[in-house]
Amino acid sequence: MVKLWYNCQGDAETPEYYIYNDRTRIGWIKNVDEDGYIDEILIYNSYRNMGYGKEALIALMNLEKRDLKLDVKVDNEQAMRCYLKVGFVPCEAWHQSKRDYIGMIWKN
């Protein structure tokens, strides 16, 4: 079962949440800002395609209790499938400077 551990250090270089499966760190979520924009989600390579990203996003949705937004590269089909499975829907990219990205939003 995936759990999120909140990192209270709170600087921009440190992940806001670490993702654990049992006692093993398997990834992190970086910077969920005041508007609900998620800067980056990473599941370590050896733990991909096992459903952990989906479980981590569901845990984050349950914690945050608000709309969440992110940008994903258009060619990152694996991440796109994960976001769609948990209820994110495509929209315009949140940061216009990211031309090869598509925005995703989850409405709480």
Question: Which residues does each predicted region cover?
Answer:
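Short hydrophobic/aromatic beta-strand or adjacent loop that forms the aromatic wall/cage
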Residues: 14-16, 99-104
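Short, well-ordered alpha-helices that flank and scaffold nucleotide-derived cofactor binding pockets
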Residues: 58-62, 85
